[in-house]
Amino acid sequence: MSAAGTIKKLGVIGDVHAEHHRLEAALAFLQTMETDAIVCTGDIVDGIGCPNESIKLLDNAAIFTVRGNHDRWILEDKARHIENAHNVTELSEESLSYLTSLPTQVTLNTIRGKLLLCHGVADDDLRKVWPGTDRMGIERSHLLDKIILEGEFQYLINGHMHFRTLIHFEALTLINAGTLRGEHWPGFSVIDFEAENITAFEFRDNQIKRVKTHDLVQEAHTIWADTQSFCGGWDPVTLF
């Protein structure tokens, strides 16, 4: 799926997990930031809040949203044993229609090049990408390597890992959107493509707080050729 228009400023919302109150607050805040568009990495269901309200908010605001693995699972009646899982019977007809119609990928045009929005990597909603740290081993992706090699996209925004970070490749910047869920750095971000930076916001004590701003491209960051060049010992560029 492709979307027309050239984006200068983009709102970025990660995995929702039915946090409809935080989603509503994030959308209202992003409206004040005068973003050209807002994206969401999916996983709308399975959480402590209301999936129908979450879906309605995304739909009414015309947010570019992709399907996450939890959205797929509820439609396939899989993994319903997980904590705070929803049942398909809890979804309205409108919500079912919305989830069924979600794409796995969305292409957007920015003033700095093309951007791919997905949940994991492209159509693989379970794929993780991680250069390797003391707490988590290396996660490589031949599919992402193919995307990098083809050179069509300059940016990729994904979710799934619930860990807002930047991973820099020579020809592409990967931005993990994080999540609205839980108490470990729940939040969202704003990318300013004119200024070439990203600003992170968090929910703290029921308020939205600005956390930090990072340059999208910076020589001090570790820059990889592709995921096969991951070698561990990475110092993550965090957005929290």
Model segments located where?
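His/acidic metal-ligating clusters that form di-metal
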Residues: 31-34, 94-171
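Short amphipathic alpha-helical segments
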Residues: 24-25, 51-53, 79, 129-130, ...
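Conserved beta-strand scaffold positions in the cores of enzyme catalytic domains, especially
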Residues: 65, 156, 174-176
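Acidic, His/Gly-rich catalytic cores of divalent-metal-dependent hydrolytic chemistry
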Residues: 5, 165-240
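Core catalytic region of metal-dependent phosphoesterases/phosphodiesterases
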Residues: 2, 6-101
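Active-site environment of divalent metal-dependent phosphoester hydrolases
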Residues: 17-22, 46-49, 70-76, 123-125, ...
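Active-site-proximal beta-strand elements of phosphoester/diester hydrolases
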Residues: 8-17, 114-123, 173-178
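Structural motif
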Residues: 62, 114, 195-197
